[in-house]
Amino acid sequence: MEGEKLRVTVKPGEYVYLDLSKRYFPLPGEVSSAGLGEPIITPEKVHLPVHCGDVDQGGKPGVAWDFNLLSLDGYSPETGWIRIDTSKLASIHIASLEKRRSVQRKASKSKKAGRVLAKYSKRERNRAGKHQLEIARVVQSVCGSVGLEELEKQGMYTRSRIWNRRISRGDWRSITRILVGRLGEAGVKELDPYGSSSYCSKCGWFNRDLNGADVFVCGGCGLRLDRQLNAAINLYMRMRFGYTEKWVGGRKRVELRMEGASRVAWWDRVVLPSLVGGCVLTGAERSDPDELVRGLHDAVRPKLHYAYDRYADAYLRIPT
């Protein structure tokens, strides 16, 4: 974009300029080359895909979500940190596994055992499906557009039997399919999950020694933040700015398209106020009235926290 004109490269060194000053639609205030798709030119019309931000027609903000084994963590500057406790969904799979294990060895030799095994499997699908629908309802109620990790289980299996069982019980793809069915493909953007937990959301430093730690510690800027929250912020930035995938020294690297803007300055201006509410927090489980919080990890808690209520048989917001 050059002012009100769109420059289209015909071949190296030769351009065609399209005047957009008389268009009937507004362009986003921060539109750039990264926010424009490839023009489709026909003899009658020019089709120009434009990224219109992360707020849908209903006014709800776009939220990026990080899938975990026992929780679903989301983030946007408008909502802050959102956490949905999915431990009840995981417990359904665990309980069903224990029941199936008792009859699975007999299923190949006994028709009755086979019918019992099929009954247990169907019951598990029905119960898990109900929770998946409830979780998707909560996601849909708090945000407009959705950014989700494009996870593939086949690439996550290891030699550990316990870990493989945990991964096989994941309901990520099922929840994604439900959201796509409700919001449409335009409302759900699948993001590359590579390094979302390992990159520092503030400065981009890569932590090679995370090793399942609950707290992300940055060796570049000193940031200490909940691991899941750091991943959700990284995914939100990929959804908002876009990203490119590169291979450097035989390693994959995901880089944001921030058009030369300072990542640290944007984080301090946009992300930090959304985490601490615009004020300086001075305590979290203090042993002394004058003891200061040691970092963001000690002060920041989810602003919206949802969990399963067995009396209401639904996922409800709980105090944070």
Please place each PLM-identified region on the residue numbering.
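Acidic carboxylate diad motif detector
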Residues: 1-41, 86, 169, 173
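Positively charged, helix-rich recognition surfaces that bind polyanionic ligands
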Residues: 44-320
